[in-house]
Amino acid sequence: MRVCFVSLCFYIFSRKTSSKVSSRDAFEKRLSELGNRGDAREADDEDNLSHSAAPKRKSAHNPAPTRACFEESMRSNSSTDFFDAFFHKALADVDEFQGFNVSKATLASIASRSGGKIGLYALQKHAIDDGKFGWNHVAGASEFWSTRDFHTYIREHVNEIAKNLPEDFKEAYFLINNYDEPQSMGVHCVDIDRLRKLHPNVGEGIVSPGDQAPVWSMSKVRGCHMDILFPFPDYFSHLRERKRSRDTPASPWSERPNDDIAFRGSTTGFGDATSNLRARALSALIDEPGFDVGLTVPIQGFQKSWAPHLFKNTMKAEDFRKFKFLMDIDGNAHSFNRQLLIAQSKAVMVRVNVFTDWIADGVMDEEFCYTIDPSDVLRSARAVRRTLLDDLERAEHVANAYHRLTRWLLRDEIVVRYLRDAFTRYVSSVRFVE
C-alpha cells in the first residue's frame, strides 16, 4: 500500500495548502445521447493485478484514490493499491453481512413475490470435480433487459470470478435486482424523508432488514441502503466498444470555446417540477450565468406544461464537444451512462448525485470530477464554477485524469477482479441455511 500511502500524504498536504474550492460515427451517436435520452434504462497501460491474492478486509488505514495515486499506479505498471483504494467502499459493503444466516427459502420467496424486480441466482460448483462453476437461475425473474449483460458476463467469466472460493465451496445464492433503484433499506436509514426531498426515487425497497437477505443492485444511496453493488448495463456496452476500438476522437480541451457548464437530458426520475431532481436542479440554474442547461423530453409522467421554461432543443455531438464542462444529474437512480459518455468526451464532469453505483464512490471530488450539492444547488454550483474558472489548468488535468481512469475501468481485468473480490467476501461472510 506504499504507493497510495505516499499519494495520500501528498493529497492531504496539497488540500491544506491550496486555496482552491473544493471510431467516430459511434462516438457521435453515443455523445448525442447526452441530450436526447435519459438514463440507460431505455487507460491503455497494462497492470499486473494479482489474481491469486485473497480480497482484503476493512483496515484502519484506507488510502484515498487520488489522482496522484492513480498516476503512480499507471507508471509503476501495478494498479493493485489503487484498485483497493478505489473500490474500498463498494467492497466493504459486503462485509456488513458478516455472520448472517441467510435463508434460501426467504431468498426464493422474495424473488417470487417481487413482480419481476428481483431474480434469485446460484453460483454452483460442478458436481463432477473439474474445478468449474455455473451461474444458474433459481427463482423470480430469469430475464430482464437491464441485467442481461451482467448475467452473460458472469457466465462467460464464472471460473475466473470463482477461482478464489474455498476448496469445499458448493453453492451460494444471490438476489439480483433488475431495477435501477435499490431494494434494501438499512436499519440506520433514519432520514429517508429528507432524502426523498432530494430525490423522489429514494425508497425503502421490498426487502426489509428483518429478512436478512442481501440484495445485489446497480445503485443505492450510501448510508441508507444495504444493497451490494454490481456493474450497470451501460458499463458492459462501453466495455465491448472499448475492445473494438482505440480512443475516440475529441477536440483538445483547451481549444474548446465554451466555458459554460452544460446539461441536456430528459426528465428521467419521479416527481414534478419542484421535486424531480433534474427539474429542481435546472430550475436553480436556468437563468444563472455560466450555465447552459435544459430539459429535452418529458417522460415518466412529467408534463412539459409544468415547467415550459426549462425545455430547450437537444444538442448534437458536435455541440457537446464545444464545452469544457458537462453536467451529470441522477435519473431514476444513479445516472449510469452519462458519466461514461462525459469521460469519453474528455470534458470535466460536474455531478449532482444522490445515488451512487459500483464505481462512483471511487471518483473523488476535485481529483476526477467536481460535485454540486443536491441540497443546495445554486450556491454550490456557483462555487464549483468559480473553482473551475480560477484554475483552468487544474480543471483540464481533472478532465484528462477522469478520461484515463474510465479507460482503466473499462477492462476485463478490473471488472473480473471486482466481482471476484465481492463474491469471495460474500461467500466468506454469510452462511446459507434451509
Give each language-model segment a name.
Residues 1-23:
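N-terminal signal-anchor transmembrane helix specifying type II single-pass membrane topology
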Residues 36, 291, 346-347:
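Short aromatic/hydrophobic-glycine micro-motifs
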Residues 315-432:
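Catalytic binding pocket for nucleotide-activated donors in carbohydrate/polymer assembly enzymes
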Residues 56-317:
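Secretory-pathway glycan-assembly enzymes, especially type II membrane glycosyltransferases
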Residues 20-59:
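N-terminal, immediately post-signal peptide pro-regions of secreted/luminal proteins
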